[in-house]
């Protein structure tokens, strides 16, 4: 488990950028060159930190999202676990979904 966490941290450090003002992560295309487990855990961690929720989205939904990203099947914004996920050129943006509780 420690070795997987090492590669998850390494993947996040090397292949993502965080913009604090917009609470947004930008993932480059090398993010998805890792093993499936590393991608899954990295994406789960990023979505959990952006959305601010205690629980992350269901595993099956995250797996489906990873498949769509790898096959370039994301055409518009996708919402998952309180986050917007969208593909722009060769990068993926993960930002917080605006809540309607006002």
Q: Where in this protein do the model-derived segments appear?
A:
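AMP-forming adenylation/ATP pyrophosphatase catalytic core
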Residues: 1-102
């Amino acid at each position: 488990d420690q070795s997987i966490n090492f590669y998850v941290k390494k993947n996040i450090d090397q292949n993502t950028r965080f913009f604090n003002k917009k609470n947004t992560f930008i993932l480059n295309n090398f993010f998805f060159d890792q093993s499936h487990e590393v991608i899954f855990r990295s994406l789960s961690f990023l979505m959990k930190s952006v959305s601010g929720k205690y629980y992350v989205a269901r595993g099956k939904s995250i797996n489906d999202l990873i498949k769509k990203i790898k096959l370039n099947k994301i055409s518009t914004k996708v919402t998952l676990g309180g986050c917007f996920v969208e593909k722009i050129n060769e990068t993926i943006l993960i930002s917080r979904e605006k809540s309607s509780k006002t």
